Amino acid sequence: MNHLPMPTFGPLAGVRVVFSGIEIAAPFAGQMFAEWGAEVIWIENVAWADTIRVQPNYPQLSRRNLHALSLNIFKDEGREAFLKLMETTDIFIEASKGPAFARRGITDEVLWEHNPKLVIAHLSGFGQYGTEEYTNLPAYNTIAQAFSGYLIQNGDVDQPMPPFPYTADYFSGMTATTAALAALHKVRETGKGESIDIAMYEVMLRMGQYFMMDYFNGGEICPRMTKGKDPYYAGCGLYKCADGYIVMELVGITQINECFKDIGLAHILGTPEAPEGTQLIHRVECPYGPLVEEKLDAWLATHTIAEVQARFAELNIACAKVLTIPELEGNPQYVARESITQWQTMDGRTCKGPNIMPKFKNNPGKIWRGMPSHGMDTAAILKNIGYSEADIKELVGKGLAKVED
């Protein structure tokens, strides 16, 4: 396979990934591959560009390092070109409503006829099979959260609230990335392709597993948080200091012993309700739970965030200031690790945003390109798989492909 023009870098150099999907979930998977060195081709509709393009800034992050192909993959010669592209593809990711690709004639078996080693990842709200009531329904972030039991666990005691921004999309995209890599590892061992069925609601079901297990195995339903505090354990969650908010986790024998001395509760240590060796204080089951919260709130309210951080560092209590967005890039840890970076957009502007993560020591990722325009790489990609200028012109003339203006 001849690769498209791009630098060689990262742990996935030489891997070709193609994705068809809009907005966040599937493209996030593609973005991870692209930032780790894979050659990633982004398929867009010929008539209508990805709706993410209407956003002023986010697409510059989410579509960096990609190659843009505008092709009607379901019709006539456009379908033929897509299947020819699959012959040189390692991983194909698609996001749609249920088995939409199969309904339109592009089944796993058809894809494997063209490439027996292809890894196929299907990403949808409710999966590739199940009941007709759900399988073919559209789904976005909040839909997956609501159907999975994840949303109902979040928010405040008075009302559930979906965690933002777009948690289910990002979790599902990362699941597609890791599952596809696992499948690719096996394919290189066996030579046999794989198809992966990723239902967004099942991803969120798994992400919401912690408290669910108490219900499935005992009927206990965990209450939601109160003002950002852990529903079960005192000293865990969001707290207000004299000049802002922190989060903390009061966990550990030594940590509890020393913290209780500071807040005036040393006398309860060693009692039947808080015996020696206590590592967590249950907010409800421990009679002292409400008192711990009361004393901790009072102590924190009289100290600044800096004072609390300094003292908790001495006591080895996990704690962090709740940073505002403007505070991020000036934070010394962000600066030291270059967590925020800059890159050039295709029109020559400078864009600022999160850097590549995680950080590979021996084969680091790289930002080598901004977001491509609609159809920017169509001609180059089609030439790469054997199409002539005349062939490409014919596809464009029939409305089956779009090249950059």
Curated annotation (Swiss-Prot):
Keywords: Cytoplasm, Transferase. It is an enzyme of class 2 (transferase). Its EC number is 2.8.3.21. SUPFAM superfamilies: CoA-transferase family III (CaiB/BaiF) (SSF89796). GO terms for cellular component: cytoplasm. CoA binds at K97, R104. InterPro entries: CoA-transferase_III, CoA-Trfase_CaiB, CoA-Trfase_fam_III, CoA-Trfase_III_dom3_sf, CoA-Trfase_III_dom_1_sf. The keyword Cytoplasm applies. GO terms for biological process: carnitine metabolic process. It catalyses: crotonobetainyl-CoA + (R)-carnitine = crotonobetaine + (R)-carnitinyl-CoA; 4-(trimethylamino)butanoyl-CoA + (R)-carnitine = (R)-carnitinyl-CoA + 4-(trimethylamino)butanoate. Pathway: Amine and polyamine metabolism; carnitine metabolism. The active site is at D169. GO terms for molecular function: L-carnitine CoA-transferase activity. Belongs to the CoA-transferase III family. CaiB subfamily. Homodimer. This is L-carnitine CoA-transferase. The gene is caiB.
